[in-house]
């Protein structure tokens, strides 16, 4: 029985299937040839590519030849190998024997085809102008002395080409982005690579700081010759772990593939450098039932210095995987890649701007680059520069690109208006009213005018699109010219360099300037093709849910009147409103301590005076919705073990993977108002967890991950000292000061809270009991809310002073604050109106007024002024 390699066995099976599906009686050499050509990873296909043949041309010719084969019209077909195929396989077996191989592989079949003179292969062979002897020499060169001694041996040839990407080739073709501002790290990498032994740099840094970019920067320097003499002419390859592992079905197959890559690198006499991204994935890869993992295969070559390797991994993975394997760790030289500063990140973005402008066909302003860095640094704390800033620029540019391809809003609105007018015109025609003709004529005039306006808008839109499209094409041409200039300079074609640098490139740059000027001078622009800071803010807002763009639109004015905005909802608490407003203003302009939370407040006071309401009002004002407030009822945290609810369970306990309610809430929404309700009810061990949060703005969860709390506002509420506070306020009346109130409450507070906990609170804010005047204001606020809800049903609600007086007198209770008032309004007003709505006494498009009749609350309909 013949021994075939896996690739040839697969090709023979495909050939039989192809003959059967095509209703052919014989499996011919052309069926096999087509099956071999379809496997682009096979040795057969790779050799054809190496001789600069055109596989596509041969594929077409073979399909054409097979279409002329005789077919069976009816019944099932069981195709048999043709005599030609049997001869071909015998010839391939002879070639294998000549080369000393046990298995017939793709290169043996290619040699057999070459000597067979079968059509259409023979005609295609003539186009390559390669002799049988040249082909055999090429195969010997590719094999590098290896033998076909296993079914999978064929997949191990040309390991570099199969399982690696040539970064220097990509750099030469201009497919890599420019690398800006990493000169020191690239120099350090070159220095380590130039060592005699252990010449293997390990790039260690957080995700997104630019480790892969350093490898790309080295590739760019290699093609420019900007490296020491010892590295000139070397090729940099990046190992594709996915390709290496994919399809390795049998034990040992993965190791064979990796060994083939290492053998190719070592046989290159130091001309090849391998870059392994996420190098920690090699530790343990392929190790099953005592088999060696990939890292152990690398160690001997790394130690000898015959393998030049650059690794890249994050600090966490380095500690978790590489440091544990001391033998592997000592073979690499660590190079720490830090996150760039804000200035360096802007510098990097400037270098990449042109690439993104050309790709998206937009313009990116300097302000957009600065905003991308600053806003990503401030509002996306769990990712790293420059990656997060680049992502912002990319997404903002793609948003503009999408808008350019969509119908502009003014045209869309006019088209909708036109459609509505045409529908109305048809309705008038059907009515045939006395004034029908007059109305129809007037309608037609409006339609004609609108159509004319639409035609003008569409013409302007088309012109703008043409200008923008033309600009994109010219910028693409400019990039191609600059790349051609660099290429010509590398090969010392100075005539071409001079032509491009001093003639063609300046001319095209001038044309681009003129087109941009004519685009900017257009009146009533329909398309925006500029990425600015407002758009970047919009993208940040979409990502994080934080209304960042409001700050750019002049939120400063709003912040100056923050007290007034809060007092519309929280009545009678001037101390708390003023202190919280000052803290938020300082945070918004960036003058607060960046290493601490935005604010840590303790609201002290009796029930129903507005402590929770102020927290809700802050969330609404800062983030446009009350849901941005994360609330924790501390009566649920009265046991020591309830700490795990906040930060997550420790390893080995149930719920470890779920995370904690506080840590996960702040990880998902770092900009939040966090409310700890009734803080005195929590266990002291639970409060100790908050010490680190309030002091450093950091929370360490059950998985030892650091959660950034620096952008959250922490509010605690408590009823501690409420009797003393109420008693003091009733005695002093209106002569109250914050310091005096705190002097009364502090002794009681110290019995519940530890000194170190109290020391980390920014401000303790007393909430005083509500007066009758405060209750009157609260009644007005509550009634306006009810009126707002009715307005959505097209019902206008009003009330007279007697209603306010009645509700404030009935709902006032100094011990319980405003909560009894809310219940009273629910019973007296909401229930009254809901019954009337259900009975049909109140209908949409009506106005009603609440008033008092013999100590009873009633409503009456009011005529709406015409």
Curated annotation (Swiss-Prot):
Residues that, per the record, bind ATP 2: 605-612
SMART domains: AAA, ClpB_D2-small
PROSITE patterns membership: CLP_R (PS51903), CLPAB_1 (PS00870), CLPAB_2 (PS00871)
Coiled coil feature spans: 390-524
Location in the cell: Cytoplasm
Domain Clp R residues, every copy: 1-145
Annotated region (C-terminal), positions in chain: 770-866
Region of interest called Repeat 1, as start-end residue ranges on this chain: 4-69
NBD1 as annotated region, ranges: 158-339
Record-level GO cellular component terms: cytoplasm
Residue span of region Repeat 2: 81-145
Binding-site residues for ATP 1, renumbered to this chain: 205-212
Protein's GO biological process: cellular response to heat
Lineage: superkingdom: Bacteria
Key word ATP-binding present: yes
GO molecular function: ATP binding; ATP hydrolysis activity
Major localisation: cytoplasm
Region spans: Linker: 340-545
Keyword field contains Iron: no
Span list, region NBD2: 555-769
Record-linked Pfam families: AAA, AAA_2, AAA_lid_9, Clp_N, ClpB_D2-small
Functional note: Part of a stress-induced multi-chaperone system, it is involved in the recovery of the cell from heat-induced damage, in cooperation with DnaK, DnaJ and GrpE. Acts before DnaK, in the processing of protein aggregates. Protein binding stimulates the ATPase activity; ATP hydrolysis unfolds the denatured protein aggregates, which probably helps expose new hydrophobic binding sites on the surface of ClpB-bound aggregates, contributing to the solubilization and refolding of denatured protein aggregates by DnaK.
Family indicated by similarity: Belongs to the ClpA/ClpB family.
Free-text comment on this protein's domains from its UniProt entry: The Clp repeat (R) domain probably functions as a substrate-discriminating domain, recruiting aggregated proteins to the ClpB hexamer and/or stabilizing bound proteins. The NBD2 domain is responsible for oligomerization, whereas the NBD1 domain stabilizes the hexamer probably in an ATP-dependent manner. The movement of the coiled-coil domain is essential for ClpB ability to rescue proteins from an aggregated state, probably by pulling apart large aggregated proteins, which are bound between the coiled-coils motifs of adjacent ClpB subunits in the functional hexamer.
Protein name: Chaperone protein ClpB
């Amino acid at each position: 029985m013949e021994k075939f390699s896996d690739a040839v066995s697969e090709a023979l099976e495909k050939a039989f299937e192809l003959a059967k599906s095509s209703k052919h009686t014989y499996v011919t050499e052309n069926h096999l040839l087509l099956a071999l050509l379809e496997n682009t990873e096979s040795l057969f296909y790779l050799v054809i590519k190496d001789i600069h043949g055109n596989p596509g041309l041969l594929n077409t010719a073979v399909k054409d030849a097979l279409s002329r084969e005789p077919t069976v019209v009816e019944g099932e077909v069981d195709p048999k190998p043709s005599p030609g195929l049997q001869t071909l396989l015998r010839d391939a077996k002879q070639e294998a024997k000549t080369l000393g191989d046990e298995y017939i592989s793709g290169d043996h079949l290619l040699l057999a085809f070459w000597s067979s003179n079968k059509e259409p292969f023979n005609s295609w062979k003539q186009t390559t102008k390669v002799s049988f002897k040249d082909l055999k020499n090429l195969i010997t060169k590719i094999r590098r002395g290896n033998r076909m001694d296993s079914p999978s041996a064929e997949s191990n040839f040309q390991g570099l080409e199969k399982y690696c990407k040539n970064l220097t080739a990509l750099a030469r073709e201009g497919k890599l982005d420019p690398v800006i501002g990493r000169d020191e790290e690239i120099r350090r990498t070159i220095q380590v690579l130039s060592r005699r032994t252990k010449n293997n740099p390990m790039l260690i840094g957080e995700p997104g700081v630019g480790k892969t970019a350093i490898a790309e920067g080295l590739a760019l320097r290699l093609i420019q010759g900007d490296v020491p003499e010892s590295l000139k002419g070397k090729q940099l390859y990046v190992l594709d772990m996915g390709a290496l592992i994919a399809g390795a079905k049998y034990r040992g197959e993965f190791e064979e593939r990796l060994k083939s890559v290492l053998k190719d690198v070592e046989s290159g006499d130091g001309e090849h450098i391998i870059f392994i991204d996420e190098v920690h994935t090699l530790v343990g890869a392929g190790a099953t039932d005592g088999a060696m993992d990939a890292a152990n295969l690398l160690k001997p070559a790394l130690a000898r210095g015959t393998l030049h390797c650059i690794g890249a991994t994050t600090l966490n993975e380095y500690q978790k995987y590489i440091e544990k394997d001391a033998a592997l760790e000592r073979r690499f030289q660590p190079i720490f890649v830090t996150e760039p500063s804000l200035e360096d990140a802007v510098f990097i973005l400037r270098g990449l701007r042109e690439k993104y402008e050309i790709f998206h066909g937009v313009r990116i302003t300097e302000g957009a680059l600065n905003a991308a860095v600053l806003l990503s640094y401030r509002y996306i704390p769990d990712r790293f520069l420059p990656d997060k800033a680049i992502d912002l620029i990319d997404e903002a540019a793609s948003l503009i690109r999408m808008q350019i391809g969509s119908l502009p809003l003014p045209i869309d609105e006019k088209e909708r208006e036109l459609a509505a007018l045409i529908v109305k015109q048809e309705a008038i025609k059907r009515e045939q009213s006395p004034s029908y003709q007059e109305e129809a004529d007037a309608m037609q005039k409006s339609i004609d005018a609108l159509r004319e306006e639409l035609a003008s808008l569409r013409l302007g839109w088309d012109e703008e699109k043409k200008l923008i499209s033309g600009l994109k094409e010219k910028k693409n041409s400019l990039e191609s010219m600059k790349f051609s200039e660099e290429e010509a300079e590398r090969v010392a074609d100075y005539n071409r360099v001079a032509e491009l640098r001093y003639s063609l490139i300046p001319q095209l740059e001038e044309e681009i300037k003129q087109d941009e000027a004519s685009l900017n001078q257009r009146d009533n622009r329909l398309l925006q093709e500029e990425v600015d800071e407002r758009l970047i803010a919009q993208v940040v807002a979409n990502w994080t849910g934080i209304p960042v763009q409001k700050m750019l639109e002049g939120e400063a004015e709003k912040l100056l009147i923050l007290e007034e905005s809060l007092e519309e909802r929280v009545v009678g608490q001037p101390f708390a409103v003023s202190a919280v407003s000052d803290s938020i203003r300082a945070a918004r302009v960036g003058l607060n301590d960046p290493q601490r939370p935005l604010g840590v407040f303790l609201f002290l006071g009796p029930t129903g005076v507005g402590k929770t309401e102020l927290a809700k009002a802050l969330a609404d004002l800062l983030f446009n919705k009350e849901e941005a407030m994360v609330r924790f009822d501390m009566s649920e945290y009265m046991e020591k073990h309830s700490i795990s609810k906040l930060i997550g369970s420790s390893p080995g306990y149930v719920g470890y993977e779920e995370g904690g309610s506080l840590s996960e809430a702040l990880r998902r929404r770092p900009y939040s108002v966090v409310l700890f309700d009734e803080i005195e009810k929590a266990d002291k061990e639970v409060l100790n967890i908050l010490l680190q949060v309030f002091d450093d703005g950091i929370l360490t969860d059950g998985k030892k991950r650091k959660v950034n709390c620096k952008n959250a506002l922490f509010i605690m509420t408590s009823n501690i000292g409420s009797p003393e506070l109420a008693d003091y306020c009733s005695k002093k009346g209106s002569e109250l000061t914050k310091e005096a109130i705190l002097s009364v409450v502090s002794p009681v507070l110290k019995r519940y809270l530890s000194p170190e906990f109290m020391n980390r609170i920014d401000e303790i804010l007393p909430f005083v009991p509500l007066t009758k005047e405060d209750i009157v204001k609260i009644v007005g606020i509550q009634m306006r809310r009810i009126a707002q809800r009715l307005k959505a049903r097209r019902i206008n609600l009003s009330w007279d002073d007697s209603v306010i007086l009645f509700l404030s007198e009935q709902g006032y209770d100094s011990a319980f604050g405003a909560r009894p008032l809310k219940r009273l309004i629910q019973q007296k007003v909401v229930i009254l109106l809901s019954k009337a709505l259900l009975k049909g006494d109140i209908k949409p498009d009506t106005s009603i007024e609440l008033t008092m009749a013999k100590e009873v609350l009633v409503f009456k309909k009011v005529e709406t002024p015409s």
